[in-house]
Amino acid sequence: MAYKTLSPAFVKPNSPILIKLAKAIPSAEITAKETKETISKMLKVALGEQMDIAKPILVGLAAPQIGISKRIILVDVKANGKGIVGDLRVYINPEIVEVSKETAEWYEGCFSTDRVCGVVERAHLNNY
C-alpha cells in the first residue's frame, strides 16, 4: 500500500526540535490556556491523521513532532497494531517509572521520519 507523504503539520525529519530535550511544564501551567491550546492542536493533528485511511495509524504523538518543545504526548492506549484505535490519552511531563523484563517486537514507523519504518523491540508493559 502506498501511503501519502508526511503531513505538513509535522516538522521535517532531523529537525533540531526532535533531538533536544523538550521543556517540562510547571504544575502551575498545566491548566493554563497555552497548555490547553497545545493539547487541542495535538488532538486535531492526531485525529486528522487517524481518520485518513490512506495513511498508517497514528498511535502516539509528541508535541515536538509538531514544532512545540513541551513534554506533552498523546498515546492511543487501544491501538493494537491491527487497526483498533480510538482512545487517545494526554500525558504531561511523562516519565517511565517501571518496565517489564519481557519484551515484544513490533513493526513501527514514526510520522517524524516520514517513510522510515522497522522492527522495534520494546518492553512488553510500561508503567507511567
Language model regions located:
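Positively charged
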Residues: 1-128
